[in-house]
C-alpha cells in the first residue's frame, strides 16, 4: 500500500496535518474550488520564489493563506509591495478578507517539492536527466536526509519512446507511518514534450519507536 499511495496523504492524521483547515456543509464544493484557484494563482505568480506548500484556513468571512517559501524576500517584495498586491488580488478573487503569512523554509534541499522543481528546471535548461538527479540527491543527503528517491518519466534525452528512470540513495521506508517522508512532483516543459519528476525524501522518524516506549515503561 505504501508503494502506491501518496506518502503525504497516507500520513495525514498520524504525523501530518491538512493543508486546508476549514469545515463547510453546503458550500464545500465552492470553497474547495476557491482553494484550488488560490493555490493555482499563487503558484503561477510566485513561480520563481521557490514556493512549496500553501496552507489555507477559513473563519467566517476571512481567509488566512500561509505561504511556505525558500525565498521570502521575493514574495514580500520591496517594502512589502509584492505581498500587498498579492493580498488585494486574492481579495478580489475570493470576495473575502485575505490575510497572508510568509514562512521561510530554512533547508530547501530537504523539501521534496522544491527538489523536484529544481530537477525540472535543470531538464528545461537541457542538463542531462541523470546528472540533474544525482546532483540533487547529493545535495539532499548533505543537508541531513536519511534517504531520497527520484524518478523522471517521459521522452528522456529526446528518445522516441517514453520511459522512466530513477535513482535511490539511503532508506525510504514508505510503509512506516512514523517515518517523516516528504513527497513532491513537478513537470519540465521541454521541446520533446513534458517530463514528469517525482521525489521522495526521508527526513527521519517523528514518533518514538515501540521498543523505546516499552523500555521506558519497563524502567519506571
UniProtKB/Swiss-Prot annotation:
This protein's record includes keyword Ribonucleoprotein: yes
InterPro entries found in the cross-reference section: KH_dom, KH_dom-like_a/b, KH_dom_type_2, KH_sf_prok-type, Ribosomal_S3_C_sf, Ribosomal_uS3_bac-typ, Ribosomal_uS3_C, Ribosomal_uS3_CS
Keyword match Transit peptide: no
SMART domains: KH
Keywords associated with the record: Ribonucleoprotein, Ribosomal protein, RNA-binding, rRNA-binding
GO terms, biological process: translation
Main function: Binds the lower part of the 30S subunit head. Binds mRNA in the 70S ribosome, positioning it for translation.
PANTHER family linked to this entry: 30S/40S RIBOSOMAL PROTEIN S3 (PTHR11760), SMALL RIBOSOMAL SUBUNIT PROTEIN US3C (PTHR11760:SF19)
The protein's assembly and partners: Part of the 30S ribosomal subunit. Forms a tight complex with proteins S10 and S14.
Name under which the protein is recorded: Small ribosomal subunit protein uS3
Organism annotation: Brevibacillus brevis (strain 47 / JCM 6285 / NBRC 100599)
Amino acid at each position: 500500500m505504501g508503494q502506491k499511495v501518496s506518502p503525504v496523504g497516507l500520513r495525514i492524521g498520524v504525523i501530518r496535518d491538512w493543508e486546508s483547515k476549514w469545515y463547510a456543509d453546503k458550500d464545500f464544493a465552492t470553497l474547495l474550488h476557491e482553494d484550488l484557484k488560490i493555490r493555482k494563482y499563487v503558484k503561477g505568480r510566485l513561480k520563481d520564489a521557490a514556493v512549496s506548500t500553501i496552507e489555507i484556513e477559513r473563519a467566517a468571512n476571512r481567509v488566512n493563506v500561509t505561504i511556505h517559501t525558500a525565498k521570502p524576500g521575493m514574495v514580500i517584495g520591496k517594502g512589502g509591495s509584492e505581498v500587498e498586491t498579492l493580498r488585494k488580488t486574492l481579495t478580489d478573487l475570493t470576495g473575502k478578507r485575505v490575510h497572508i503569512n510568509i514562512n521561510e523554509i530554512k533547508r530547501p534541499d530537504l523539501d521534496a517539492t522544491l527538489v523536484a522543481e529544481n530537477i525540472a528546471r535543470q531538464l528545461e535548461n537541457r542538463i542531462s536527466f541523470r546528472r540533474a538527479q544525482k546532483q540533487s540527491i547529493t545535495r539532499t543527503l548533505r543537508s541531513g536526509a536519511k534517504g531520497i528517491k527520484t524518478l523522471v518519466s517521459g521522452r528522456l534525452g529526446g528518445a522516441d519512446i517514453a520511459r522512466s528512470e530513477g535513482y535511490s540513495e539511503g532508506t525510504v521506508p514508505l510503509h512506516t507511518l512514523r517515518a517523516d517522508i516528504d513527497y513532491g512532483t513537478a513537470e519540465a516543459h521541454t521541446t520533446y514534450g513534458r517530463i514528469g519528476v517525482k521525489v521522495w525524501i526521508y527526513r527521519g522518524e517523528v514518533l518514538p519507536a515501540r521498543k523505546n516506549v516499552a523500555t521506558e515503561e519497563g524502567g519506571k
